[in-house]
């Protein structure tokens, strides 16, 4: 859309290439910066909107913001930074991206040491939100806390990689933090 700093489409989890997206009337919502933050922090719905693969970005934004090199989950921080530099987004309700789960994907493998980088990403977002968008600091903090529980949940669902030697110490850290965040 003309004037938008980035555009996004809906995604659908698919099991095979024959799966058809639901048919619905095409609608494009134009969001201001507040609307973008609401969407990023899942205040408007419970979908995850902080990945890069369902978006197209205006070149000028990409000259100001870079991916956090070498990090897993780098697109989460990237999109947080994009919103800080954007004024308008065009969001389509049409499914144009199909997310195929496979057993060897990062999402479905056992926990590895690099999964702990999610905590570092959300910690940085929580710190940056104090300056960039203070009204969302609580939401950023909740996502930081949720990252701890998410790694524990992944370990229960998919197990832990045999190569993760520090898992027991990290597991104890995650349990202690989760208890403090949610039960103290």
What are these model-derived regions, one by one?
Residues 103, 129-133, 154-162:
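Secondary-structure edge/capping motif, primarily at the C-terminal ends of alpha-helices
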Residues 34, 120-141, 177-184:
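C-terminal, non-catalytic tails of nucleotide-sugar-dependent glycosyltransferases
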Residues 90, 95-132:
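Glycine- and acidic-residue-rich phosphate-binding/metal-coordinating active-site segment common to enzymes
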Residues 3-4, 158-184:
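Membrane-interface aromatic/basic loop that binds lipid-linked glycans or pyrophosphate carriers
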Residues 1-90, 100, 104-113:
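Donor-binding/catalytic cores of nucleotide-activated saccharide
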Residues 81, 120, 124, 169-173:
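Alpha-helical elements of Rossmann-like donor-binding domains used by nucleotide-donor carbohydrate transfer enzymes
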Residues 137-143, 165-169:
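Short, charged, amphipathic alpha-helical segments
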Residues 142-154:
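Amphipathic alpha-helical repeat scaffolds of TPR domains
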């Amino acid at each position: 859309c003309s004037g938008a700093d980035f555009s996004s489409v809906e995604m659908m989890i698919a099991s095979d290439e024959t799966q058809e997206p639901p048919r619905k009337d095409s609608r494009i919502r134009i969001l201001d910066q507040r609307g973008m933050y609401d969407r990023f922090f899942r205040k408007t719905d419970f979908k995850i909107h902080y990945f890069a693969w369902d978006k197209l970005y205006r070149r000028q934004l990409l000259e100001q913001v870079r991916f956090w090199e070498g990090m897993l989950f780098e697109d989460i921080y990237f999109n947080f930074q994009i919103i800080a530099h954007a004024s308008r987004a065009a969001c389509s309700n049409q499914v144009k991206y199909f997310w195929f789960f496979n057993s060897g994907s990062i999402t479905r493998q056992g926990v590895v040491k690099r999964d702990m980088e999610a905590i570092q990403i959300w910690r940085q977002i929580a710190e940056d939100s104090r300056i960039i968008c203070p009204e969302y600091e609580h939401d950023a903090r909740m996502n930081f806390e949720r990252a701890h529980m998410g790694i524990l949940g992944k370990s229960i669902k998919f197990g832990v990689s045999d190569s993760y030697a520090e898992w027991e110490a990290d597991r104890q850290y995650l349990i202690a933090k989760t208890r403090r965040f949610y039960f103290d």
